[in-house]
Regions:
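Short loop/helix-cap segments at secondary-structure boundaries that form the rim of catalytic
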Residues: 45-52, 141-146, 172-176
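Glycine-/Pro-rich loop/turn segments that contact NAD(P) or position catalytic residues
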Residues: 101, 105, 113-137
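ATP-binding N-terminal substructure of ATP-dependent carboxylate-amine bond-forming enzymes
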Residues: 1-108
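ATP-grasp fold ATP-binding core
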Residues: 128, 136-140, 144-161, 178-190, ...
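Glycine-rich phosphate/pyrophosphate-binding beta-alpha loops
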Residues: 155-158, 216-226, 268-282
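Phosphate-binding site of ATP-dependent enzymes
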Residues: 164-246, 256-257, 261-263
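ATP-dependent carboxylate activation and anion-phosphoryl transfer catalytic cores
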Residues: 77, 232-323
């Protein structure tokens, strides 16, 4: 299925300069003059919006008219491809996906049911288990084992997560908060290695590429130093997650590994912050999305990405001349 609408819209662009640039690099390979546009609550203060071919202010994601504003903007700007980037907009977009599809606009978002599973870490654990991938045990709060790890079941970027060494570290508020779950503690400082995997699923939920990235250093929840690794985790995922019902586009999954022991931790049905490393290694997800959704092409399985490619991030700037 092709669409006459060719422009691309990256939502909540914020600081995602590299993601915008990756899409621009791929869009430039086509002869249709594809533009890569961006939205933000305050585009004037968004570096990615200044790098994009055009930028637009939209209401907060929590606003009732958020979806309507995105829909109207997409029609106005000839948008054929919409790329979500943050967790809090995913469910709304998944629920509205068919409305956009009927207008020839493709939101790269997984089915609503899968997004619901991914947004709740309790359900995510069950999904991993159905794929025959182990997960850290989730304890009943009346029967905790120490040390353990506490985190909100709908949290992201490690916000609200806390290591609990003994019962003395527990607070009343933590125990009474219905969103906090208590999990088996996995030592990623001394024993296990943390990986994020960028998985590309076609529109039928078939896995077309998987690139594991070792998280060498993390800053405020986002990888600052990472390396691609073709390892046992890669082999496992090609076998166990070759099909994921309802998955679509880039899916970012987190794992803790030690030898042949693998724990699935979470799944985010969107581009992750460390995706530019996968793109640099040859995982051309932006180009594949353009080909699959704007031009109706089939995407073949790809495993020729560069192994052991290291990414070392640094702070950069965008200068804006005020008028």
């Amino acid at each position: 299925m092709t669409t006459n609408k060719k422009n691309i819209l990256i939502l909540s662009a914020g600081r995602r300069v590299e993601l915008v640039q990756d899409f621009q690099a791929e869009a430039a390979k086509f002869s249709d003059g594809i533009k890569v546009l961006a939205t933000d609550l305050n585009p004037r203060m968004s570096p990615a919006c200044h790098v994009a071919d055009g930028a637009f202010s939209v209401p907060p994601i929590s606003a009732e008219n958020y979806i309507d504003s995105i829909f109207d903007l997409a029609l106005e700007q000839n948008i054929g491809l919409i790329i979500p980037t943050i967790d809090t907009e995913l469910q709304k977009l998944a629920d509205a996906r068919r409305r956009f599809e009927e207008a020839g606009i493709h939101i790269i978002i997984s089915d609503s049911e899968l997004v619901t599973i991914c947004r709740d870490k309790r359900f995510t654990a069950s999904l991993f288990n159905r794929c025959d991938i182990a997960t850290p045990e989730i304890y009943e709060r009346e029967n905790l084992t120490f040390p353990c790890f506490a985190k909100p079941y709908d949290g992201s970027r490690s916000i609200g997560a806390k290591y609990i060494h003994t019962a003395e570290d527990l607070s009343y508020d933590m125990l009474k908060d219905p969103k906090i779950i208590f999990c088996q503690y996995i030592d990623i400082t001394n024993e296990f290695t943390e990986f994020t995997v960028d998985l590309y699923y076609d529109r039928s939920g078939r896995l077309k590429c998987a690139v594991p990235r070792e998280r060498l250093e993390v800053r405020t929840g986002e990888v600052s130093k990472g390396a691609t690794r073709r390892n046992g985790l890669y082999t496992l995922l090609i076998d166990k997650m070759s099909h994921l019902e309802g998955a679509r586009g880039c899916i970012t999954a987190q794992f803790f590994c030690k030898g042949s022991t693998v724990y699935g931790i979470e799944i985010n049905p969107r581009f992750g912050g460390g995706f530019p490393l996968t793109y640099a290694a040859g995982g051309n997800y932006p180009g594949w999305l353009i080909r699959e959704y704007l031009y109706g092409e089939k995407i073949p399985f790809f495993d020729e990405w560069e192994n052991n490619l290291i990414m070392l991030r640094y702070d950069a700037k965008v200068l804006v001349h005020e008028k």
